[in-house]
Amino acid sequence: MSVEHSPVDPSAEPPEKAEEAALRPGALAEFGGQQRVADQLGLVLAASKSRGTTPDHVLLSGPPGLGKTTLAMIIASEMSAPIRISSGPAIQHAGDLAAILSSLVPGEVFFLDEIHRMSKPAEEMLYLAMEDFRVDVVVGKGPGATAIPIEIPPFTLVGATTRAGLLPGPLRDRFGFTAQLDYYEVADLERIVTRSAGVIGVELAEGAAHTIASRSRGTPRIANRLLRRVRDWADVHHESPVTPQGAETALDLYEVDPLGLDRLDRAVLHAVCLKFGGGPVGLSTLAISVGEEPQTVEEVAEPFLVRLGFLMRTPRGRVPTDRAWRHLGLEPPPDSSGEGLF
């Protein structure tokens, strides 16, 4: 079983990135959901504009698909500034970072995705650049090596991470504004789906946006992906406007159930409940039983199942809750470890 093209995988596939860009809002006022973060960030940007200064460095953390890249682009747009985009894995040497920083123009926004994956030497160079707008380039080797300071123009670093706990304290402390993005409410996702439908030219009947939003796992990227799959179905079946029943039929075809569970999620639940009699079962054994890599099970399926209250991670292994048994149409056994917890 492969989830590489699962419609509810929160990571973006390369072909999707151009489609995502077309659906991104260009201003904070258009950014759906995350109202607290949008209000706080709006205040930071407005104050910077009134003072004529560059905004503080910004750290955005949270699961994939919640809008970190979109917010970075909005920051640049709101400040009428250019944006430079890179990622932690692409910066493995201090020289790579020095080349980028030394070519920034005043006020430019530097978006560094997956900042937690940057190399240690580059990370240490970034400390000085963020604080003093300077980088020290070492020339020569051994005892004769000399550090040459290079001034860089004021810039705003926007760092994005899905694993904020991996960032060292000295790096986190240099961000003037930090925000944790949360999963979206269905009502917010409905507004996002409605807006995106207008952008890509899909007419939705009343209730269709809710059908899509409720299966989107609280994630805008997934909501927009499901909308595109519904559009495909509607084009082939000549349905316009798309009704809630039509959207439901399309998403059933892609094996996304009303809670947003896909084939892998259900396979994990079946394995834990039926193959292993309610567990506990270890990750490696569970992965083998569903035909997936342990990392895929741990990073794609389990977080959502835990968030729904269907699965517990215990020191002895994975255990289903009573809700998981009932979702499969089964009564939990009398000695169920998840009895009464959810």
UniProtKB/Swiss-Prot annotation:
A GO cellular-component term linked to this record: Holliday junction resolvase complex
SUPFAM superfamilies xrefs: P-loop containing nucleoside triphosphate hydrolases, Winged helix' DNA-binding domain
Region (Disordered): 1-21
Name of the top EC class for this enzyme: hydrolase
Pfam families in the cross-refs: AAA_lid_4, RuvB_C, RuvB_N
UniProt KW Cytoplasm keyword: yes
Binding site for DNA: R313, R318
Region (Head domain (RuvB-H)): 258-342
One annotated GO biological process: DNA repair
Catalyzed reactions per annotation: ATP + H2O = ADP + phosphate + H(+)
Entry superkingdom: Bacteria
Binding site for Mg(2+): T69
Region described as Small ATPAse domain (RuvB-S): spans on this chain: 185-255
Keyword annotations: ATP-binding, Cytoplasm, DNA damage, DNA recombination, DNA repair, DNA-binding, Hydrolase, Nucleotide-binding
Residue ranges, annotated region (Large ATPase domain (RuvB-L)): 1-184
Quaternary structure (record): Homohexamer. Forms an RuvA(8)-RuvB(12)-Holliday junction (HJ) complex. HJ DNA is sandwiched between 2 RuvA tetramers; dsDNA enters through RuvA and exits via RuvB. An RuvB hexamer assembles on each DNA strand where it exits the tetramer. Each RuvB hexamer is contacted by two RuvA subunits (via domain III) on 2 adjacent RuvB subunits; this complex drives branch migration. In the full resolvosome a probable DNA-RuvA(4)-RuvB(12)-RuvC(2) complex forms which resolves the HJ.
NCBIfam families in the cross-refs: PRK00080.1, ruvB
Task of the protein: The RuvA-RuvB-RuvC complex processes Holliday junction (HJ) DNA during genetic recombination and DNA repair, while the RuvA-RuvB complex plays an important role in the rescue of blocked DNA replication forks via replication fork reversal (RFR). RuvA specifically binds to HJ cruciform DNA, conferring on it an open structure. The RuvB hexamer acts as an ATP-dependent pump, pulling dsDNA into and through the RuvAB complex. RuvB forms 2 homohexamers on either side of HJ DNA bound by 1 or 2 RuvA tetramers; 4 subunits per hexamer contact DNA at a time.
Similarity field: Belongs to the RuvB family.
Name the record gives this protein: Holliday junction branch migration complex subunit RuvB
Source species of the chain: Cutibacterium acnes (strain DSM 16379 / KPA171202)
